Amino acid sequence: ISRFAHYCREQRITLPEKNFSIRYRSNIPRHVGMAGSSALVTATLRCLMEYYEVIIPEEIQPNLILSVEADELGISAGLQDRVIQVYQECVFMDFDKDLMERQGHGTYERIDPELLPNLFVAYRTDLAEGSEIFHNTIRQRWLQGDPRIVEAMKWFAEFAQEARDLIVAGRGREIGPLLDANFDLRRSIYTLSPANIDMVERARSAGAHCKFTGSGGAIVGVYEDEAMYEAIERAFADTGILVLKPEIV
């Protein structure tokens, strides 16, 4: 709320004096890398914009949301989750450093969800750890210019670009190896819990390709057909891990 008020002051937007109260309710699983905390901030910003009839450009909203989490709540994170929540679509994000410095935000490209391959999501029903724990040491090493971390981040960006190019070209079914490469690289620089690694290995044992959705506790992957999806379900049977097919619109 304070960040919204500060933004309006900066933009010389006069807010009418009227009262409100905010109550939260969420069905997003906690601490499994599904951006539950940022969803609350995003929803609050959206409510404030509607209530006060203030228009904030879509490309600016993720920056504002992240500033709340980083500066007010001390959470180390990036813009990705906030971009998706603001745009509410499938989006390719370019965070090129020069571009970010020049325009103050990334370049966000909407992708037709009809071009996506078959996707599944699996998540743990027991609690994992918060993303602030997962990201803190890596962020610090990146800020310090650790060559290994800087190089890894370049590769993550390259994987995303290659996946985007395949999807836009109508070859979305070919992105599987890029998901595997993403996870393998992440595993090489982060300390991952055995339970989270087990999720990926179970999905791979069924022939699927997958990666974390976020900081751990949930994975997103691709599968070829219903036979493979059923094999994935069997791989997670009796583990307390739920598997579903996301509806992307």
Where do the protein language model's features map onto the residues?
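Conserved glycine-rich beta-strand-loop-beta hairpin in the small C-terminal domain of fold type I
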Residues: 217
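C-terminal nucleotide
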Residues: 1-16, 25, 63-76, 80-211, ...
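Anion-binding (especially nucleotide phosphate/pyrophosphate-binding) glycine-rich loop
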Residues: 1-64, 203
